[in-house]
Amino acid sequence: MPMNRRTFLGKSCASLGALAILDAAALRAQSAAEEGSMADWTGRHLNEGNWSADAIFLSAIKFLKQPEDIVRVSMPFGGGMGQKDLCGYLTGGFMAIGLFAGPKKASDNAARKKCSQLAKEYYDWWTKNYPLHCGEINKSQTEPCDYKLMGQKTAAFLQALFERESNKG
């Protein structure tokens, strides 16, 4: 059955509108499935096989609603850069702070200063709670380290930091 242009465009727009509504409903359902805290997400990411740096950074990416594929930059930092060196939770947290507060332009000195302040606050918190290097973590404790709990505590600290700074607005 032949259709004139106006009828065709009307039906096309109606179909696209219905698809947009269905897509929005799917997006809301996906968001509901992703609800939770950075600590919850970090635990899930660890259970899925992620290492420290990518687990903490991926949780921050989700919290900050950024594209998840950027997590790839954190992969080499897990396991203390694969050498039991600087802990991946520490380095992943620094990447998360950069994503949250880092300057979008090199000339943004205010953002650079804020990012540095948050990084210092995180570093100070970290060094009060954990050694810097993965190889020292079990040696410094009387009981074996619970890496998942350590990651969740780190994620909770970062989320509180992000929420506090976001509320300053």
Task: List the model feature ranges, each with a label.
Residues 50-98:
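Small-residue-enriched, tightly packed secondary-structure blocks
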Residues 100-126:
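Mid-chain, well-packed structural core segment of small domains
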Residues 24-45:
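C-terminal segment of N-terminal export signals and the immediately downstream linker at the start
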Residues 37, 51, 55, 68, ...:
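Conserved active-site and cofactor/substrate-binding residues in soluble primary-metabolism enzymes
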Residues 1-17:
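N-terminal secretory signal peptides and thylakoid transit peptides that target proteins
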Residues 40-47, 76-85, 139-143:
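A short glycine/serine-rich beta->alpha loop
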Residues 116-169:
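C-terminal binding/interaction regions
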